[in-house]
Amino acid sequence: MPAVKVVERTPLFLKAVVEGAYPSLVNSLRRVIISELPVMAIDTVIVVNNTSVMYDEMLAHRLGLIPLTTPLQSLPPIEDCESGLADPSECTVRFTLQVNADGEVTVYSGDLVSERPDVVPVHKDIPIVKLVKGQSIVLEAYAKLGRARGHAKWQAALASYYYYPRVEVRDESCRERCREVCRDLTNPLECTFNKAMTCRDLCGDKLHVDWERNKYVFWVESFGNYDVDTALREAFRILKRKYSLFLDALARKSSSAAEAKL
């Protein structure tokens, strides 16, 4: 049974030591977090007026990359949005942007007006474009649920892991020699496996580096669309669903093969 010990935690970041899990499971979780988590992102932009120096296409591209808060608990499951089971209006949020410059102004992400107060830019101070006197931007933008496997603008978080290193210092002079790389050679949370290997190159046989089998340091960092706890819960839900679909398909295949033999 895998054991998890959380060693660092904030609303948007989590680092944990995972022990007793196969690499395939840990890597599957990492891949789901990176490419499968559903988030809102602007996907369609209707430009009514744009007299700024920025092309409409570049303006739309910038809007798409603005991270938006995504209240999963009040949105349909991403699978229903993708399959058409959910009402399209429930999977889409409309934004408007209207700025008329009386002088030199910077248009920020906070100037976007959402029809839903719970789906708004994560950060209000992301610059979009600068306007000078007489210039204006008027547009409508539509955000929808999506996954990062379709486009990077739908990426909700980063995740990675490394094998838990086992370091044996055979000469104390090696600690000082490696201080710039690792302040504490024997602390696996500070001195990653790659850093330990770099120190081994500096110290030679005065430092022995190995790793714990089926033990890892795993970390997740959210971009702010939702907190890291929500990201992990959703990742496990998606992973569990994938396993269920696979087992169902395997059972049907086995049943068909058995009937064919009869």
From Swiss-Prot:
Domain of life: Archaea
PROSITE patterns: RNA_POL_D_30KD
Pfam families assigned to the protein according to its UniProt record, in alphabetical order: RNA_pol_A_bac (PF01000), RNA_pol_L (PF01193)
GO molecular function ontology, one term from the record: protein dimerization activity
Localisation per UniProt entry: Cytoplasm
Cell membrane recorded as keyword: no
Any Gene Ontology biological process: DNA-templated transcription
Enzyme Commission code: 2.7.7.6
Subunit relationships: Part of the RNA polymerase complex.
Known role: DNA-dependent RNA polymerase (RNAP) catalyzes the transcription of DNA into RNA using the four ribonucleoside triphosphates as substrates.
Family label: Belongs to the archaeal Rpo3/eukaryotic RPB3 RNA polymerase subunit family.
Protein's UniProt name: DNA-directed RNA polymerase subunit Rpo3
Organism of origin: Pyrobaculum neutrophilum (strain DSM 2338 / JCM 9278 / NBRC 100436 / V24Sta) (Thermoproteus neutrophilus)
Lineage of producing organism: Archaea, Thermoproteota, Thermoprotei, Thermoproteales, Thermoproteaceae
GN (gene name): rpo3
